[in-house]
C-alpha cells in the first residue's frame, strides 16, 4: 500500500470515529445540553466542531507517521494499540455524556481517556517526535474538556 493511501486511511479513521461520536452529541445540544448549567467560560457551541475536526486530522497525521515508520514492529504495534484504545474511549465519552446523560461517569471516563492519550504520546514519541507533538493540542483540549466536564457535573449535581 502506498503512503498516500495510508495517509488518507489514517486521517479517515479518527474523522469517521469523531463524526460517529458527534452523531450522539448533535441531537442533545438543543435539548438536554442547553438546559444544563454551564460555566461562563465555556466556549461557544459552534467552536467545538472545527476544533474537534482539526484535532482528528492531527491525530490522523500522527497515526500515519507511526504506521509508515520503520520502527521495531513491537513498538509500532504497542503505539497503534494505545492509539486505538484512546480513540475508542474518545468515542464512548460522547455516548456517556450526551446520550446517557451520565456527567459523573463521563468525568471518570475522560480521566481514563487522558491517561491513554498520554501513554499514546509517549509511545508515539519513541517512534516519531513529530507524531507525539501532533497529539499535544489533543491532550490540551481534552484537559480543558475534562475541566469543563467536571464543572458542569458540579453545577448540575
Positions of predicted regions on the chain:
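Hydrophobic alpha-helical segments of small multi-pass membrane proteins
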Residues: 80-87, 106-120, 138-142
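Membrane-interface helix termini and inter-helical loops of multi-pass transporters
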Residues: 27-40, 68-73
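Membrane-interface helix caps and helix-loop-helix hairpins in membrane proteins
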Residues: 73, 93-104, 126-129, 153-157
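Hydrophobic alpha-helical transmembrane segments
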Residues: 4-8, 12, 79-84, 107-108, ...
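Membrane-interface loop-to-helix entry segments
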Residues: 43-58, 102-113
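Helix-adjacent hinge/juxtasegments
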Residues: 57-94
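Terminal transmembrane helical module of multi-pass membrane proteins
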Residues: 125-157
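N-terminal signal-anchor transmembrane alpha helix
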Residues: 2-24
